[in-house]
Amino acid sequence: MKDCLFDCDGLMFDTERVAQDMWREIGRSFGVEIPDDLFVAITGVKDTRALTPYFETVPHLQDILDASRKKRFDLDFWASFYPDGLNKKGLVALNQYLDENHIPCCVCSSSKKEYVETLLRTVSVPLHFDSIVGGDMVEHGKPDPDIFLLGASILGVDPENCLVLEDSKMGILAAKRAGMHSCFIQDTIKPDDEMRENIEFEKEDLLQVIDLLEELQ
């Protein structure tokens, strides 16, 4: 592998569980209970097209979406849940390994670039990424491959030499469509049969990705 492309939420940072709690809290403020399958539909996607059926069944959904977006950019909000930081196990060690071995890496997130930069500021140890690609930088989000292809292009690496690290179904599908290798690290989403068919590698955490990279060299 000549580079690593990282998803952000749920992969680098333990934000998905907090986001679900946040959605539930905001929903209740509107007198609405958020269904569990809505979280599966929204995880790893750029826009709200995947939520189209829910706009008919979940009252005030647009208001809930708007309120959640505002909170996502609030560092104090994240710090209230994780005073010691949001980073997932192995993030710092893997990032240092990539840096020491001169392997380029890029964050490729469905979220806006500004939001990714907000989360990076929560880490006590500075992380090195050669670039950040946000969902606001491409026309089509995951499961389309645009985000990963742009990341590879910025790093100057051919798709077949890229390893994508993902925790979502849409991200795994996007990696497959980009012609890249993928490693799934489970967070809140349990793989279904379709997802299993597209997962090339699977590890418990980012720390184990170091061993995978050693094997692939």
Where are these regions (language model features)?
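Asp-based, Mg2+/Mn2+-dependent phosphohydrolase catalytic module
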Residues: 1-2, 96-99, 112-113, 117-217
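Active-site neighborhood of HAD-like aspartate-dependent phosphohydrolases
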Residues: 1-40
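Short beta->alpha linker loops
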Residues: 18, 46, 86-90, 111, ...
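An amphipathic alpha-helix signature
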Residues: 20, 24, 36, 47-52, ...
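Helix-loop "lid/cap" segments that line or gate small-molecule binding pockets
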Residues: 26-27, 46-61, 119, 151-152
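Short helix-capping segments at alpha-helix termini
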Residues: 29-33, 57-64, 124-128, 156-157
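Metal-dependent phosphoesterase signature
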Residues: 54-96, 101-103
